[in-house]
Amino acid sequence: MCRLRVLLLLLPLAFVSSSALPIHDVDSQQNTSGFLGLQRLLQSFSRLFLKNDLLRDLDNFFSSPMDFRDLPRNFHQEENQEHRMGNHTLSSHLQIDKVTDNQTGEVLISEKVEASIEPERNPEGDWKVPKVEAKEPPVPVQKVTDSLHPEPRQVAFWIMKMPRRRTQPDVQDGGRWLIEKRHRMQAIRDGLRGGAREDSLEDGVHIPQHAKLPVRKTHFLYILRPSQQL
């Protein structure tokens, strides 16, 4: 109620000052334009607050004073309120903080109040939120082509010959295969057979089958490039 009384005391002073102020010329009117704007602002406040229904709810809007000595050393509180005042909605946000320094014992107390007045909204008027129609996602349009005449495309690939890997070292001195026992046994058997077939091998040189090197195959690498539309 203290704030309301201060506001009511300012209203008569504004009316008296505006009526007692003479207006002589254009210069004086320009100098008093700011004061006239303040007078109109006070008049709009008087029309809003000097109503019986607003006066009844005005005391309930302002919270009762709080004794900060009873609060703990560190305190934080936020409170939101809404009050219907005639055709208007009065919203308030109250925030109280108390912080105590443990080293120096300093106490910092802050109280913050934010208030706003909103007029009654007409759901069928300008405040109506437009409805957002759900649209179907666009479907990608495929290029129409004749099935009998497909589009020509260019296909290319590269052929690379892979290097051969040597699986076994080359035979040196013609007798590396005699290292293992089975090779030696095979040589003895081949020697015995060679004496019995000496006549049949006069025209050629006998080469043991196990001494022949394996046949090496050639490998190729094919790299296909993606097709390109001509």
UniProtKB/Swiss-Prot annotation:
Glycosylation site residues: N31, N87, N102
Keyword Signal: yes
Alphabetical keyword list: Cytoplasmic vesicle, Glycoprotein, Secreted, Signal
Record PTM: N-glycosylated during spermatogenesis. Not N-glycosylated in mature sperm.
GO BP, one annotated term: penetration of zona pellucida
Subcellular location: Secreted; Cytoplasmic vesicle, Secretory vesicle, Acrosome
Disruption phenotype: Nullizygous embryos Dkkl1 mice develop into viable, fertile adults.
One GO CC term, this protein: acrosomal vesicle
InterPro entries, sorted: DKK1-4, DKKL1
Domain of life of the native organism: Eukaryota
Signal peptide limits: 1-20
Tissue expression: Testis-specific. Abundant in the seminiferous tubules where it is associated with developing spermatocytes. Expressed only in testis (at protein level). Not detectable on postnatal days 4 and 9 but after day 18 it gradually increased as the development of testes progressed. Expressed at high levels in testis and at weak levels in epididymis.
Known function: Involved in fertilization by facilitating sperm penetration of the zona pellucida. May promote spermatocyte apoptosis, thereby limiting sperm production. In adults, may reduce testosterone synthesis in Leydig cells. Is not essential either for development or fertility.
Record text on subunit structure and interactions: Interacts with SLXL1; Co-localize in seminiferous tubules. Interacts with SLY.
Recorded domain comment: Contains a N-terminal domain similar to that of the N-terminal section of DKK3.
Protein name: Dickkopf-like protein 1
